């Protein structure tokens, strides 16, 4: 009995040791689950964790000398590209990192200066200025007709207007109305104003030659009456021409568009007054399309003024 009891106690002891060993093997913290974890005084686990994170991401302090040279070069290139890429992203300007990271060498600087000096010493080929092409203006095909020419001449002598009015034909003199003798001839059909100072104005001729011829005829009449008349300083003072554009014109639109040059008061005068600057001509434009040009000293000014105004009038043609 004693032997069996001792054997049983031994087996029970072995079983207890096996159970205790298995529990420590598979659940080693089981005996300590009920114990609370107490941190050591002066220890901060959060700072330790953050420090570990920083160490895990920052490899700048890691010794990479054991790596091959090509891997070290790639790492350096990546570090150089990172700030340049951030700069490009912030500023919006595309920069070449390879050019920024590699400064000019002395030889490259010398080559650059030589290139610039070569550019300065290169001969400059003179450029011929091109005259801009101006569109050819549409010709009107209309030639204004001269209606009146006013000319002046100096007879260079004092005249007795009463004697001229009494002895000359087709002459009238009324000093209360006008202080000049009004004389007319039929060929060319003109009128002369003769003043006592010897100045004479001839008007009504249709051409320059007719105006000169008429002035000479009036001077001959004065000579025949006993005055020492001469023929000096003949000059054409004004030429008047007229034409028809053959279409009605919107004068209201024309005066609004060309306010600086034109005036239109239909209650006072039915025509629009257009004062052209070059040539210095005054035009009277009517709704019917009739145009009167005055103020010219030469025939060419009449033609030039009409060619300038014709495209403008065509732009204000009435559609109905």
Curated annotation (Swiss-Prot):
Any one annotated GO CC term: nucleus
Molecular functions (GO terms): DNA binding; DNA-binding transcription factor activity; RNA polymerase II general transcription initiation factor activity
SUPFAM superfamilies the record matches: TATA-box binding protein-like
One Pfam family per UniProt: TBP
Compartments reported by the entry: Nucleus
Keyword tags: Developmental protein, DNA-binding, Gastrulation, Nucleus, Transcription, Transcription regulation
Principal localisation: nucleus
Tissues in which the protein is found: Expression is restricted to the gonads, and is higher in the ovary than the testis.
Gene Ontology annotations of biological process type: DNA-templated transcription; DNA-templated transcription initiation; embryo development ending in birth or egg hatching; gastrulation; transcription by RNA polymerase II
HAMAP family reported in the protein's UniProt record: TATA_bind_prot_arch
Similarity comment text for this entry: Belongs to the TBP family.
Function, as annotated: TATA box-binding transcription factor. Members of the TBP family are differentially required to regulate transcription and development during early embryogenesis. Required for gastrulation. Regulates a large subset of genes that are ventrally expressed. Binds to a subset of promoters.
Protein's name in the database: TATA box-binding protein-like 2
Organism from which the protein derives: Xenopus laevis (African clawed frog)
